[in-house]
Each structure stands twice: as C-alpha cells, then as structure tokens.
Swiss-Prot record:
Family that this chain belongs to: Belongs to the purine/pyrimidine phosphoribosyltransferase family. Xpt subfamily.
Entry binding sites for 5-phospho-alpha-D-ribose 1-diphosphate: A129, N130, G131, K132, A133
Gene Ontology molecular function, alphabetical: xanthine phosphoribosyltransferase activity
Protein's organism: Bifidobacterium adolescentis (strain ATCC 15703 / DSM 20083 / NCTC 11814 / E194a)
Coiled-coil ranges per UniProt: none
Compartments it resides in: Cytoplasm
Xref: SUPFAM superfamilies: PRTase-like (SSF53271)
GO biological process: purine ribonucleoside salvage; xanthine metabolic process; XMP salvage
Protein name: Xanthine phosphoribosyltransferase
Alphabetically ordered keywords of this record: Cytoplasm, Glycosyltransferase, Purine salvage, Transferase
Length: 193
C-alpha cells in the first residue's frame, strides 16, 4: 500500500536492533483515516471470504482492528490480553508467545465466551516480525475450533521471515507494507516490490 509506505518513509525512524518506530501514526498516535484506508484494502483483499470476527492482540492492534471491523460489516473485535487480570473470569484459551519488541515471553489469553467453534476469524496486527505473536493467535483459534480466514498486517519486516513462514504454512497473509531492509545508520528503508 503506497500510502502506508510513504508514511513510513516520511515519519518512521529506523532504530538499532531492527526496530522500526512508527508511533507518529500507527501504534502510539493513531491516524484513523489511514486505518480506514487500510481497512478498505483488506476488505478488497479478503473479499469473498466469510469473516465474522476480528482477533488481535493488545495493545497496538486494537485501534487498527476496530476501524477495520467497519469494513467487514461491523463484526466484533476480540483482543487477546497479555496478562491475567481479575476482569478475566470463566474459561479461557491461553498460550505463550515471544515478543520481538519487548524481548520476552508473555501469556496471551482470550475468554472462551468470545472465541467460538465455527467462527471465521481475520487476524489483524500492526507488525509482523518473526511471527510468534500471530502463531499464538492461530493456536488460540485452533483450540477454539475457529477458522483463520486470513491475516492482515500493517507492516511486515520481510527480512525476519515470519510472514514468509506463515504463507508457506498456507495462511493468506496480506501485509500492506513489507520492509525488505532497514539501515539505522543512514535511516534508509527498502520495501519488497
């Protein structure tokens, strides 16, 4: 998606350790109009698929997922929580994932009330690096008996291989911007064509 790539080049910052900072418009301050355009792009890509639920992971995916849901008939958005809390009651699906950004493992939890057998789920997230978070969400869907219809990613770090691995496993991954390489010394970002 050219618009997203242009925003990344204009407002993104390449940091050491393969970190791409896009907090000016994607995952701290949110550009809702951009999210709306992203939703339209995913609605076009996943046209013809039954989507009756969107699943993401807290926190950065929530804003994107809520705007995207409007393009799929206002389907419910469920977000996996990263920590147990007193608000989470009843039966739950739980797995553990490794966060590239946070450099640690954490639990991801979804109430069994909100992820059900027979659901047709679109996974949405802001970033895809090594794919561990998405694999955790996929595991939760499989445990629930839900079908993963597709995966919508704002920014994929193509050089980290997670997206390619998910595609090889048969998942329909639509990344709107795939970063092929980044250089923190001169700030350059190259996209996959």
């Amino acid at each position: 998606m050219k618009e997203l790539e242009e925003r990344i080049v204009q407002q993104g910052t390449v940091k050491p350790g393969n970190v791409l900072k896009v907090d000016a418009f994607l995952n701290h301050q949110c550009d809702v109009e951009l999210f709306d355009h992203m939703g339209a792009a995913w609605a076009e890509h996943f046209k013809g698929k039954t989507i009756d639920k969107i699943l993401t992971i807290e926190a950065s995916g929530i804003g994107i997922a809520c705007v995207v849901a409007r393009h799929f008939g206002n389907v419910p958005v469920v977000f996996a929580k990263k920590a147990q809390s007193i608000n989470l009651d009843g039966d739950q699906y739980t797995t553990t994932v490794y966060s590239f950004t946070k450099q640690k493992e954490f639990p991801v939890i979804v109430s069994k009330r909100y992820l059900n057998e027979g659901d047709h789920v679109l996974l949405i997230d802001d970033f895809l690096a090594n794919g561990k978070a998405l694999k955790g969400l996929i595991e939760l869907c499989h445990e629930a008996g839900a079908t993963v219809e597709g995966i919508g990613i704002a920014v994929e770090k193509g050089f980290q291989g997670g997206g390619d691995q998910l595609r090889e496993e048969g998942y329909d991954v639509d990344s709107l911007a795939i970063v092929e390489s980044m250089d923190p010394e001169n700030g350059t970002i190259e996209f996959r064509s």
